[in-house]
Amino acid sequence: MKTVLLVIKVFLLASMVLSCATSSNAFREIDHAVDQADFTAAVDAVVRGQRGHRGQRGSRAIYTERNAISLFMDKGLLEHYAGNYAASSEDLQNAERLIEEAYTKSITENFFSFIINDNTREYPGEDFENIYLNVFNALNYYNSGNTEGALVEIRKLSQTGGKLDMLARRYDYTDPETGASLNDIAQRETGIRDLPEIASVNFSNSALARYLGALFYQANGNIDSARIEFNQIELAYRTNRNIYRDSVPRAVEEARNVPAGLARLNIISFTGLSPIKQEQLIAHYLPFRHPILQVAFFKLPVLVKRPSVITRIEVAVEGAGSFRLELLEDMGAAIEETFSGRFSSIVQKTYIRTIIKYAIADITAMEMARQQGELAGLMIALTARTAMDISESADIRMSRYLPDKAYIGGINLDPGTYSVIINYYNGNNLISRDTYADVVVDNNGLNLLQSVNLR
């Protein structure tokens, strides 16, 4: 009896910790500002959502101490969209630092999370966040006039041993001595034979990162490195079919071969909002003796799409013509692909944790039924199951303001100054328009115009 009471107390304590979990409703103010493309107001709303901010009650804080990575990611992205590149760079660098530190956290904290719930530890960040923060920080550097700094960010992703290279291998780990996979190791350590398998991740090359790298190398006069990056775009399309389902955009080849005497105006546009995590209940049969404990409901984080209303983007350059932007990278698909490996790991960990909890409860309930009757056993089983269900919640923390898609296009022009209009359509209906006056197009450097529409 003392054992089950102790177990229940632990689970109820965990439920108190998790009761402050943030729901998507808490982000309404930020989401509204983003929908209105008022990114400065969105940043202000994020700041108000920090724990400890003046006037913000701790129990209502959106970004707690355990969710610092999401804070820096959200704030850094929104600062970028608002054109505050220095502030954005600082925030994204903080997010990157915390993600790196999360990999080296003590095994004690990880063990506690293993027994209770992922929400009991600091949010470690997702693989896709660790990748795309470098893309946007590269654009921060470029927009601040620092092309070399932009290339440093891109090389963090693309070089041998970089983030994309490591991601491709992380979930295909094998023990160098025994050749055991992650699944084999988990089964050996837990003794549970029917564990869900950890999926591999097929995202080892980013056309978006390669495209930006090629343009930055061109701007620095490093033609050979630019050639390699352009070639890597084609390789990314061939080897990552879950993400790149169409042919390489024509704009890639056009940017690669600009006629002598002309200057290239390149356009990159980010649209929509990437998928976000939501909690999903999944029922699963467990082979325990007490009927109350034979069905468990796993609470798992699943990605849910946020469809964009934008179906077409057209660019008009005054006196030079118009062209349509082409999809370069489905960032939402890349996010889903990179999350698949982590999701499998989460399912496996949740499964193990649930088995352990229910096994303790089943043993205690059956023993109580034997000693004091079926009603006593039923009460123990019901109480334990309720406590366990309360103690569980899916970890839905993540960055909410990554774009869903990246489009590119461009036009070869005589060097000069132009007016540029970017039109966003839903079918034949004009949704919004970005106008850029006095755009200087020079044949001695990179002419990259960036637009964002997250609707």
Predicted regions and their residues:
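Bacterial Sec signal peptide processing site at the extreme N-terminus
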Residues: 16-41, 50
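Residue-level signature for tetratricopeptide repeat
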Residues: 32, 71, 78-79, 140, ...
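Extracytoplasmic/secretory-pathway proteins
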Residues: 157, 175-406
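Boundary/linker segments of alpha-helical solenoid repeat arrays
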Residues: 54-66, 99-110, 161-172, 234-252
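C-terminal soluble interaction/assembly domains
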Residues: 366-455
